[in-house]
């Protein structure tokens, strides 16, 4: 498995993402943008990208902060992520830069066909939903315990992607009110969506290191089921079965 570090322009900032693919696989493949949690371009993000790439996809791990800007704790992560959460236009601009870089770099290597998707975790889940709201040419967008709130709700007919969102029922970061608002938003926009909610599961449940009592915690069963659902959802989207 290769992970090519790639610097790319993101407005006035230079970002650094990673293009991940199995160079032992021949033929063109779908491309999947992966938006990591608010800790950004970590080893964990690369490992998640490799997990997705193992399904015969080309994966690009997005950098939402800029090369060399890597939070070392939750406080620094919040200081970087929260202004973007409040600014949907800037958030969309940054995730779109990663999306366009993925396509350009993968095409240069003759790796991809014309099928695209995006998967995001936590903060990254919100990133990919903003990309979908912006009308990106996506077969699918998957948000895993991600941000559902937006300052710019989807416009009627704008969302091209089929959407899958997965959450823990008692997750205080994305409470039921946010899930209900997201459902209403996407119904009004005419989007195709699915939502999976796990009882007793907190925020960041796919992260083994998550351990904040009452807020975040790893859940092995929900993680396994979410990855299986994501795998099937992407396969169905790429085969036009959704």
What are the roles of these predicted feature ranges?
Residues 108-121:
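Alpha/beta-hydrolase fold nucleophile elbow
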Residues 48, 175-186:
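Short alpha-helix in the alpha/beta-hydrolase fold that links the catalytic acid
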Residues 187-242:
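C-terminal catalytic histidine-bearing segment of alpha/beta-hydrolase fold enzymes
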Residues 5-111, 206-214:
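Serine-hydrolase catalytic machinery in alpha/beta-hydrolase-like enzymes
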Residues 137-147:
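A conserved short beta-strand
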Residues 120-124, 128:
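Gly/Ala-rich beta-loop-alpha elbow adjacent to hydrolase catalytic centers
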Residues 159, 165-167:
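Short beta-strand/loop motif that positions the catalytic acidic residue
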Residues 170-174:
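Acidic catalytic loop of the alpha/beta-hydrolase fold
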